[in-house]
Amino acid sequence: IKMSSLGDILHTLPFAAALRQRFPKAKITWLVHPQFAGFVPDPPVIDEIIYFDKVKFNKMNLLAKLAYFVEMRRLLHSKKFDLVIDMQGLFKSAVLAAISGCSNRIGYCEMREGSGLVSKAVCGSHSKDHVIERYLDVARYLGAEVREIMFPLPDLSKETVSVQEKLQKNELQGEYIVVVPGARWKTKEW
């Protein structure tokens, strides 16, 4: 479970790659908000994506929210997971881990908002290092040998063609560096 945000999803990619290397025949499912699903790696790294639509959920009344959770519980139970890994470590991910039907639940060391009551926190030797290393500590706990940090990005060939077509259409040539000077939170704009 790693539902958001963009940077957090990208930081989790090396964990997903290490998990796939450790368990090459496992079926690995990722639970994510739909707006970030395009950054979840394609097969063979991730086999299936389950969506939790936070935008839609936040617009629901209480009864509709309960129905949404009942449906999500049914879906998660139907998967019969052997292990649930909560890489989000927040209340919302803890609830989803709890209703998954899987009793074997772990998460990375920095679990907050009560998520540590639902899943076992896995802390490794990189607790003071970059979050990527802290996520990889969970993979190491599961027996992965992390020799290099890999970022299994999804196939972006269609997007590449689209950008190339737009550059040609606008008669722009050469190499470019694209800068997106923005952030979702004001505190992250510097």
Where are the model-predicted features located?
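Catalytic machinery of carbohydrate-active enzymes
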Residues: 1-190
